[in-house]
UniProtKB/Swiss-Prot annotation:
Has a dual role in the assembly of mitochondrial ATPase. Acts as a protease that removes N-terminal residues of mitochondrial ATPase CF(0) subunit 6 at the intermembrane space side. Also involved in the correct assembly of the membrane-embedded ATPase CF(0) particle, probably mediating association of subunit 6 with the subunit 9 ring. It holds the Pfam family Peptidase_M76. It is an enzyme of class 3 (hydrolase). It is a peripheral membrane protein. It is found in: Mitochondrion inner membrane. Residues 1-11 have a biased composition (Polar residues). It comes from Pyricularia oryzae (strain 70-15 / ATCC MYA-4617 / FGSC 8958). The keyword Mitochondrion applies. A divalent metal cation binds at H170, H174. GO terms for biological process: mitochondrial protein processing; mitochondrial proton-transporting ATP synthase complex assembly. This is Mitochondrial inner membrane protease ATP23. Keywords: Hydrolase, Membrane, Metal-binding, Metalloprotease, Mitochondrion, Mitochondrion inner membrane, Protease. Belongs to the peptidase M76 family.
Length: 273
């Protein structure tokens, strides 16, 4: 499943809305049927106008004359503008990590032992558009794994090489679990499979280490910080599955498998990062 960012799409499937769609919204169907109101940019309301120069828009951000929604659309506009640069940087960093990163090389070797192969052909960098819903949620991701296609890295969401290393490690744990246990990755039959691989991926990838939580997400908690991070990110990822009803359902499923999956560090002897 996708490496979640702070806001991930919910997996509920409410009844179809019957009201007329407003001009600044478009309905998007995701996760097996959920209907979300995705906001398009309205320069008169947001202050962001793609027809003006980058520096004019940047000045609006500095002076507070661009709304939070406008800043979201401005950022997405820059991602589109800089797509070629971001893809080139992502591919260079990916290749470097496959040559020199201990965790990436180790996971690649373990996947090979199970008959799989990960390389530039099935670990691909792409621009992944985020979307802003009418209720203010940002739907985005840093990467994703598909048993049929391999690993997707969202080049525009990757901050630096260390972030890419964590993202690759997360998705490679999913690939390992798929090859070793043939897990029900998307949770079509059993959400507990999805919950277990998400717990393991967040635990083993390094994305929940204290320094990233503190300096990256502003969470300075010391007691139980690691466990809380792994649990919350697993819940977010399970929540995004189509068969998950709501956050309460996701929490229940994660709790059901927590003890066995949180203690399972395979293929590592212990938590590496």
């Amino acid at each position: 499943m996708a490496s979640p960012q702070d806001n991930t799409p919910s997996g509920a499937t409410p009844k179809p809305q019957t009201h007329e769609e407003t001009p600044d919204q478009v309905k998007l169907r995701i996760n097996g049927g959920e209907r979300l109101n995705i906001r398009k940019n309205n320069p008169a309301e947001t202050g962001f106008d793609p027809a003006t120069s980058k520096w004019v828009n940047y000045f609006k951000v500095l002076t507070g004359s661009m709304t939070k929604e406008g800043q979201f659309h401005y950022r997405e506009h820059l991602y589109r503008t800089n797509e070629e640069r971001d893809l080139r940087r992502c591919e260079e960093q990916r290749d470097w990590l496959f040559r020199y990163s201990p965790v990436v090389r180790y996971m690649r070797d373990q996947i090979r032992l199970l008959g799989g192969e990960l390389d530039a052909d099935n670990v691909v960098c792409r621009r992944c558009p985020s979307r802003l819903t009418a209720d203010g949620r940002i739907l985005g991701q840093a990467g994703g794994f598909s048993p049929q296609h391999g690993i997707l890295v969202c080049a525009n969401s990757i901050r630096d090489r260390k972030h890419l290393e964590d993202t690759l490690a997360h998705e490679m744990v999913h690939a390992y679990d798929h090859l070793r246990w043939q897990v029900d990755f998307v949770g079509e039959k059993d959400l507990r499979h999805a919950a277990c691989t998400e717990i393991r991926a967040s635990m083993l990838s390094g994305e929940c280490r204290w320094t990233r939580e503190a300096f990256g997400r502003g969470n300075w908690t010391v007691t139980q910080q690691f466990q809380n991070c792994v649990r919350s990110r697993a819940i977010m990822s399970v929540r995004a599955r189509a068969r998950c009803r709501d956050t309460e359902h996701a929490t229940k499923v994660v709790n059901q498998v927590w003890d066995s999956c949180f203690s399972d560090t395979r293929p590592f002897d212990e938590i590496y990062k």
